[in-house]
């Protein structure tokens, strides 16, 4: 079964399921506990929430990661066993000096928050100007990234 994660949402599951999301300028924060075969994806839309009691914690990098870790822990995952991967953050629209590159800001914030949580990024597929679909296999923690007709595993 495939768990589909919508924009600004968080999904967690155990093997043999997989988790999938479609990304543009958003960033997927992907965590996986290899020993327990538990994984999760946060579909981050924006860099930071100023509200610590955010109703939709998956929407922001600074609230998504702690919530993702908590939800995975409820299934039995351990923070010290997590592998971290990032994908997304495309520049979907032409940016000029007067516009903000949301994809770039999401990448920067996601990396910063991962570091703050004491996690290390194992691999990533970030940036560019094309959206992508990612699928996390909870059997082995591999992440299939589809960008147009291109496929790669991170």
UniProtKB/Swiss-Prot annotation:
- Keyword set for this entry? Chemotaxis, Hydrolase
Swiss-Prot/TrEMBL GO biological process terms: chemotaxis
The free-text function statement in the UniProt record for this protein reads:
Probably deamidates glutamine residues to glutamate on methyl-accepting chemotaxis receptors (MCPs), playing an important role in chemotaxis.
Among InterPro entries, the record links this protein to: CheD-like_sf, Chemorcpt_Glu_NH3ase_CheD, Cytotoxic_necrot_fac-like_cat
- Coiled-coil spans in chain: none
Q: Which reaction does it catalyse?
A: L-glutaminyl-[protein] + H2O = L-glutamyl-[protein] + NH4(+)
Enzyme Commission code(s) on record:
3.5.1.44
> What protein name is recorded for this chain?
Probable chemoreceptor glutamine deamidase CheD
Domain of life, source organism: Archaea
Q: From which lineage does this chain's organism come?
A: Archaea, Methanobacteriati, Methanobacteriota, Methanomada group, Methanococci
One Pfam family, short name please? CheD
**The protein's enzyme class:** hydrolase
* Isomerase recorded as keyword: no
GO molecular function, a single term: protein-glutamine glutaminase activity
Family note: Belongs to the CheD family.
